């Protein structure tokens, strides 16, 4: 059955036997959806529909308690544990909070407590719930929520998260302490990760929550370590008798922060319900501007003794409640599908939608990612679809609703020619991305390439914005990057909304950009798949534009961050006569590229020319500081121990790298001896 079919049944007129069967079927359906969402991270219904069905089941069981299903979603949290990780039983059950969906319901929760209370208020992070166990102040293991009773042991992955303390910041740690929190990926990191995934693996994550959950469930912790996950702590689970529990929830959060955990910047202590309403109003309006996704707000009774008095249900605490924001997923209709052309020629399908409000914004366009996604989701022109603002930023079509499909719905096909310049569209190596072959002859690519060229991390021409670039291209005043440096005052003031002062500011900004670093210039010229990090690596390796132009494939693939695909892109770039002409025009008009300064390494008998691995934490050095220090005296610092490793510098909590060094007979240097050697 579908959600709509459940809603369409007139359950209030069913006979008792039929009603019981309906309740059982609804409970089974929700259990299956919970499994798909919590365990497999592959939901097939919207959050809004799940919440409505859950409330329907609650209402039916409240009215007919004799029909309450055994072991249903009303009694437990999440789903079953995936195979592939060791399962561990939680020392204290990981419950979840009851939900409310309006201020009126939130007021009811407040009034039922029957005390004059303070509420600790915080955002409800949309990530992966985790429980981290500490023994005598040191990280022991980490477990996912799982089904609330037991979860997956993901210790090695969690330890890679930079803001997870491996040692509690206290001289008197409790014997045992279980800290709970949410692992998230912020919006900007999610977008960057998806760009990388699209380029290197031809797939993307649907949203930041799926990206965080998928990362933590990876078997290779080295891959996880490259993803900028963060932990936000929200409380504790099990604790030993020697733990001195604070008197309030707010003080507990401050204590966790003092231990080294990150807590939300948006926590607030409300002294009455009026302040609760103010907090709700503030966070509802600030939600879109937060760096991370939240799907609601959490309100907890602040007094710990009062929490104990109020108690728990089988599902979770009665002293806390989650207010869930209105659904960010709504239905709309696909009016048409158009194809946009990006900087590298990538053709992206965009759905033109019947305008609909999503998260306070009127959405009429949504990305369809690529033609493979359209086919996988079976999206057609004329379909009713679910629309979501992914990451609260980019509207996307989540899925079609084929049960409402019209007979004249049109299948979407990839065009054979560019919709802008009519050049041929190619699909290289059978990847999901199709590209226009027009290059600089395609106005869409030209415009996007020029926007990239002037961007902050490239040439940083800050007064030359995207809209002005579009105006200049449309007026045929610029076509190639060097044309920007030929613009004059009269040309700029002749454009719409360009007064004398604005025009002069643009010219000053252009002049200021004429001495870029080599790394900025490499990034600015827009070689496919070359990002900021790759540009730095190339600039530092070659030292000059001339050397970079003469780069050979065999040399390129030996450089950090440069694989075979990027190396091929670089070689192809310099084999294109138009690219060479564009770069030569820069030099002809007086662009002075600043080559990186070569740092001469000081000689050190112990470290120069040696391959070194750093492990553990140090009292007198930060890891980054120590790495830079070793490099400055000629050492090669690597991340893993092998037969080629000359020495391992070992701090506290060294772990497996120390063990491997000892097995291989690699020299181990402790911090106490390090200062003498340096």
UniProtKB/Swiss-Prot annotation:
InterPro entries: BRCT_dom (IPR001357), BRCT_dom_sf (IPR036420), DisA/LigA_HHH (IPR041663), DNA_ligase (IPR001679), DNA_ligase_CS (IPR033136), DNAligase_adenylation (IPR013839), DNAligase_N (IPR013840), Hlx-hairpin-Hlx_DNA-bd_motif (IPR003583). One of its GO terms (cellular component) is cytosol. Residues 602-678 form the BRCT domain. The keyword NAD applies. Zn(2+) binds at residues 418, 421, 436, 442. One of its GO terms (molecular function) is DNA ligase (NAD+) activity. Gene3D superfamilies: 5' to 3' exonuclease, C-terminal subdomain (1.10.150.20), 6.20.10.30, BRCT domain (3.40.50.10190), DNA ligase/mRNA capping enzyme (3.30.470.30), Helix hairpin bin (1.10.287.610), Nucleic acid-binding proteins (2.40.50.140). One of its GO terms (biological process) is DNA repair. HAMAP family: DNA_ligase_A (MF_01588). This is DNA ligase. The lineage of its organism: Bacteria, Pseudomonadati, Pseudomonadota, Gammaproteobacteria, Thiotrichales. The gene is ligA.
